[in-house]
Amino acid sequence: MAASQCLCCSKFLFQRQNLACFLTNPHCGSLVNADGHGEVWTDWNNMSKFFQYGWRCTTNENTYSNRTLMGNWNQERYDLRNIVQPKPLPSQFGHYFETTYDTSYNNKMPLSTHRFKREPHWFPGHQPELDPPRYKCTEKSTYMNSYSKP
């Protein structure tokens, strides 16, 4: 009669085999952890860390893009690269899909793609040209407010 293993030992053995399979073939699993800043760390071997954020010595290491954070749809939508892109030309079949309401009330003039000039910014992801005018006057530091004329 064969000896049977208890349930907890077989579960531990199964988890250990899965981990061994995962470490030998890292593309079949997801043992990738991310911290709060969106950097993804993988540590498969001794050389993999030199290709990750924080270990590389490149000039664009800290440049921020809207692809840094997962699900960052708000910044992706209002990014200058997306706003400045011109709308596609109307299709020859577009009039079939227009509603009466759309033709009556949504008469939008085409916006120019040159309406945004790049302004000085504080960090790579900052887009001050999208700020409304009432907020542009608040770009003074506390030092400037303390030592300027009243």
UniProtKB/Swiss-Prot annotation:
<dbReference type="InterPro" id="IPR037662">
    <property type="entry name" value="CFAP68/107"/>
</dbReference>
<dbReference type="GO" id="GO:0030317">
    <property type="term" value="P:flagellated sperm motility"/>
</dbReference>
<feature type="region of interest" description="Mn 2">
    <location>
        <begin position="140"/>
        <end position="150"/>
    </location>
</feature>
<keyword id="KW-0963">Cytoplasm</keyword>
<keyword id="KW-0282">Flagellum</keyword>
<protein>
    <recommendedName>
        <fullName>Cilia- and flagella-associated protein 68</fullName>
    </recommendedName>
</protein>
<dbReference type="InterPro" id="IPR009524">
    <property type="entry name" value="CFAP68"/>
</dbReference>
<feature type="region of interest" description="Mn 1">
    <location>
        <begin position="99"/>
        <end position="110"/>
    </location>
</feature>
<keyword id="KW-0206">Cytoskeleton</keyword>
<comment type="function">
    <text>Microtubule inner protein (MIP) part of the dynein-decorated doublet microtubules (DMTs) in cilia axoneme, which is required for motile cilia beating.</text>
</comment>
<comment type="subunit">
    <text>Microtubule inner protein component of sperm flagellar doublet microtubules.</text>
</comment>
<dbReference type="GO" id="GO:0036126">
    <property type="term" value="C:sperm flagellum"/>
</dbReference>
<comment type="similarity">
    <text>Belongs to the CFAP68 family.</text>
</comment>
<dbReference type="GO" id="GO:0005930">
    <property type="term" value="C:axoneme"/>
</dbReference>
<dbReference type="GO" id="GO:0005929">
    <property type="term" value="C:cilium"/>
</dbReference>
<dbReference type="GO" id="GO:0160111">
    <property type="term" value="C:axonemal A tubule inner sheath"/>
</dbReference>
<keyword id="KW-0539">Nucleus</keyword>
<dbReference type="Pfam" id="PF06608">
    <property type="entry name" value="CFAP68"/>
</dbReference>
<keyword id="KW-0969">Cilium</keyword>
<dbReference type="GO" id="GO:0005654">
    <property type="term" value="C:nucleoplasm"/>
</dbReference>
<keyword id="KW-0966">Cell projection</keyword>
